[in-house]
Amino acid sequence: MPSKNGPLRVGIGGPVGSGKTALTEKLCKAMRERYSLAVVTNDIYTKEDAEALVRMQALPSERIVGVETGGCPHTAIREDASINLQAIADLNRRLPELDLVFIESGGDNLAATFSPDLADLTIYVISVCQGEEIPRKGGPGITKSDLLVINKKDLAPHVGADLEIMERDAARMRGEKPFVFSDMKRGDGVERIVDFLILHGGL
């Protein structure tokens, strides 16, 4: 149920190509029967991710809003989140029954984080293809996100990444904070992410 403070807002961040849009699509398809959902995507100069989600039929088009952030996508989710907050306010007006809004950041680096004014929970997505050392490199996305998703685990043998090393490093860098290995192509790991959102988001 949406609270008097509005819907749960979940930020989805991660480097370009890590699988943010694929994750957003899978979460929408897994949760849309039970909850009233919407998505705000951030792209630098286009609305490409929003259009991709409409094409994937993740949600009806009126529930997907794309914002163009200009040159610094991380500013729109952190220092000046007003463009995203405005998009959420507009969705709220049109869809007053909203339970949950996903905010997908533009492709960013390991240092980008969501402002607490914008996101109640944060998911950070990295890809096995970026190298097995990514978890131990740290950065706020790795260490501070509420949930770390290590995506494309199926490609580990092809890129020479050792999942056991990645698991050990992620556990060391994150302490008690959870992380999940996933393969969005096959939907592997989606259920655990949904369970996390229900448990920690109070849905």
UniProtKB/Swiss-Prot annotation:
Gene Ontology MF term list: GTP binding; GTPase activity; nickel cation binding
Keywords: Chaperone, Cytoplasm, GTP-binding, Nickel insertion, Nucleotide-binding
The keyword Chaperone appears for this protein: yes
Coiled-coil residue windows: none
Gene Ontology cellular-component terms listed: cytoplasm
SUPFAM superfamilies attached to this UniProt entry: P-loop containing nucleoside triphosphate hydrolases (SSF52540)
Source superkingdom: Bacteria
Cellular location(s): Cytoplasm
Residues that coordinate or bind GTP: 14-21
Biological process per Gene Ontology, one example term: urea catabolic process
KW GTP-binding (keyword) present: yes
Subunit and partners: Homodimer. UreD, UreF and UreG form a complex that acts as a GTP-hydrolysis-dependent molecular chaperone, activating the urease apoprotein by helping to assemble the nickel containing metallocenter of UreC. The UreE protein probably delivers the nickel.
Protein family (similarity comment): Belongs to the SIMIBI class G3E GTPase family. UreG subfamily.
PANTHER family attached to this UniProt entry: UREASE ACCESSORY PROTEIN G
The protein's role, per its UniProt record: Facilitates the functional incorporation of the urease nickel metallocenter. This process requires GTP hydrolysis, probably effectuated by UreG.
Protein name: Urease accessory protein UreG
